[in-house]
């Protein structure tokens, strides 16, 4: 019985740590950027209205559609390109 309780406790800790990583602060969206190795970025929701950011999203839709195994919004471009585009939006 003690083993079951300790396993349940470990499961709760793991689910909390996973939720903490995947949660984005209010007003932000987590995106994964890169071609082979993905890096997580938090972008303001206001970027969704910007044509240059929408172009990146269209590229993502063309490559992955709406069902990507990573589970998050993935943008398949070089990190430098993403930083260049988003730095102009600030």
UniProtKB/Swiss-Prot annotation:
One matching Pfam family: Auxin_inducible
Q: Which InterPro entries match?
A: SAUR_fam
* Entry's induction text: By auxin.
Q: Where in the cell is it found?
A: Cell membrane
Domain of life of the native organism: Eukaryota
Which keywords label this protein? Auxin signaling pathway, Cell membrane, Developmental protein, Growth regulation, Membrane
Q: How does it sit in the membrane?
A: Peripheral membrane protein
Keyword Transport assigned: no
**Which Gene Ontology BP terms does the record give?**
auxin-activated signaling pathway
What's any one GO cellular component for it?
Answer: plasma membrane
Mark the transmembrane ranges: none
Task: Cite the PANTHER family for this sequence.
Answer: SAUR-LIKE AUXIN-RESPONSIVE PROTEIN FAMILY-RELATED
Family per similarity comment: Belongs to the ARG7 family.
Q: What does this protein do?
A: Functions as a positive effector of cell expansion through modulation of auxin transport.
Q: What is this protein called?
A: Auxin-responsive protein SAUR22
Protein species of origin: Arabidopsis thaliana
């Amino acid at each position: 019985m003690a083993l079951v309780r300790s396993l349940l406790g470990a499961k709760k800790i793991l689910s909390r740590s996973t939720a903490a990583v995947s949660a984005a602060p209010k007003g932000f969206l987590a995106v994964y950027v890169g071609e082979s190795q993905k890096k997580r970025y938090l972008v303001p929701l206001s970027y969704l209205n910007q044509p240059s950011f929408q172009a990146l999203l269209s590229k993502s839709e063309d490559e992955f559609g709406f069902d990507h195994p990573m589970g998050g919004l993935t943008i398949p471009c070089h990190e430098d390109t993403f930083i260049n585009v988003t730095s102009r939006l600030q």
